[in-house]
C-alpha cells in the first residue's frame, strides 16, 4: 500500500524499514506500492517512482534485503492519470492546482474524477504512445532493481482503468468507444513491457473487476479481458474493484471481492484475491474452495507486519523464524 513518504520518487529509510519488516515477518511475496512511471503520473508528490535510473539503487536495497529473508519481490508500476496531483492523505488528500504545487493531470477524456477537481488534459495519440514507452522503460528498471515479479496497475481509477471504463473514456478514436478500443492501451502496454521483462519472470495485472456503477466497467468485461491477457502471457490477475467513480456505492464486507477472483479464475488464468481478508481461516477457505490461487494482504500487514510468522506458529506449516527473533516464539 502507498506510503506517501518519498521525495522525488526516491526510496528512503522509511521504505527500507517498512518493506524490510514485512519480509522479516514472513510474507511469501513482498509487493511494493504503486510506483510511478512518470513524475506527472504520481498520485501525490510523495509517491515512489521508477521513471529515472537514479531511483533504481534505492529499490535494489529493498529487493536485496527481502531476498536475504527468503521473500520474493514484486513491484506495481502505475500512472495515476486524472487521479494525480493530490496532497497526501495525511494532509487531506485534496487535488492540488499548479499554483499549490500540483501539475496538469492527463486522462483519456477531459472528465475530472470529481466535480470539484480540475479537468484533466485529454491525451492525444502521440502522448499515449509516450506513456506506453514510459511503462516499458520502468519495467526495464524494475528488472535492473532485481524484482522477481512485475505488476501493471490497471485498477482503482488510475490511467489504464480510466481508458477501460466507458464512464471516464468518451474518446471517438481507436482508444475509445468499443470494448476492443478501450482495452487497446492496456494491451499495448503489456505487449511492450514483455519485450523487456524476462519471459521466465511472472507478469501480473491488477484490474478493478467493476466500477460499482451502472454503465461502467463490468465484471463481464473484466472476465473477457482477463482471458485475452492470459492468452497474451499475463501470469496472474490481481482482482480488486472500484476507484474510478467518486459516487460509487461499494458494499464493503469481509472478502467482498473474492467473487470476482472466482469468476475470473474460470478463464484459466491464476488469480489473487484481495480486500477485507483478515484471518487465516478466511484465507484457507478461499484457497481450499478454489476461489483464488493467492491471497494479497494490505491493511492487515499495516496492523501486524509479522502476521505470517505469528499466524503459523504451532501449526504444521510454521514459517521459519529469523534467528534474531527466536526468543520471541
Report residues per predicted region.
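Flavin-dependent oxidoreductase catalytic cores
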Residues: 1-329
Amino acid at each position: 500500500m502507498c506510503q506517501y513518504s518519498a521525495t522525488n520518487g526516491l526510496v528512503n529509510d522509511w521504505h527500507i524499514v517498512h518493506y524490510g519488516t514485512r519480509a522479516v515477518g514472513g510474507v511469501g511475496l513482498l509487493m511494493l506500492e504503486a510506483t510511478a512511471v512518470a513524475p506527472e503520473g504520481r498520485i501525490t508528490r510523495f509517491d515512489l517512482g521508477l521513471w529515472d535510473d537514479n531511483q533504481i539503487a534505492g529499490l535494489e536495497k529493498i529487493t536485496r534485503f527481502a531476498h536475504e529473508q527468503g521473500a520474493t519481490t514484486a513491484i506495481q508500476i502505475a500512472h495515476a492519470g486524472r487521479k494525480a496531483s493530490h496532497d497526501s492523505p495525511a494532509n487531506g488528500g485534496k487535488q492540488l492546482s499548479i499554483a499549490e504545487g500540483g501539475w496538469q493531470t492527463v486522462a483519456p477524456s477531459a472528465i475530472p474524477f470529481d466535480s470539484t477537481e480540475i479537468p484533466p488534459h485529454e491525451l492525444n495519440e502521440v502522448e499515449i504512445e509516450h506513456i506506453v514507452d514510459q511503462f516499458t522503460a520502468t519495467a526495464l528498471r524494475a528488472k535492473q532493481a532485481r524484482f522477481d515479479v512485475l505488476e501493471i496497475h490497471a485498477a482503482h481509477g488510475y490511467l489504464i482503468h480510466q481508458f477501460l471504463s466507458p464512464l471516464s473514456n468518451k474518446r471517438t478514436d481507436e482508444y475509445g468507444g468499443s470494448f476492443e478500443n478501450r482495452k487497446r492501451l492496456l494491451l499495448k502496454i503489456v505487449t511492450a513491457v514483455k519485450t523487456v521483462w524476462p519471459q521466465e519472470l511472472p507478469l501480473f495485472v491488477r484490474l478493478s473487476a467493476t466500477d460499482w456503477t451502472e454503465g461502467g466497467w463490468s465484471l463481464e468485461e473484466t472476465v473477457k479481458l482477463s482471458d485475452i491477457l492470459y492468452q497474451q502471457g499475463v501470469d496472474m490477475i490481481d482482482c480488486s474493484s472500484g476507484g474510478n467513480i467518486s459516487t460509487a456505492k461499494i458494499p464493503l464486507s469481509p472478502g467482498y471481492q473474492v467473487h470476482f477472483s472466482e469468476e475470473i479464475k474460470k478463464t484459466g488464468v491464476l488469480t489473487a484475491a484481495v480486500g477485507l481478508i483478515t484471518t487465516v481461516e478466511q484465507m484457507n477457505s478461499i484457497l481450499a474452495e478454489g476461489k483464488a490461487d493467492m491471497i494479497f494482504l494490505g491493511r492487515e500487514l499495516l496492523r501486524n507486519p509479522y502476521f505470517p510468522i505469528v499466524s503459523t506458529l504451532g501449526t504444521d506449516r510454521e514459517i521459519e523464524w529469523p534467528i534474531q527473533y527466536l526468543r520471541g516464539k
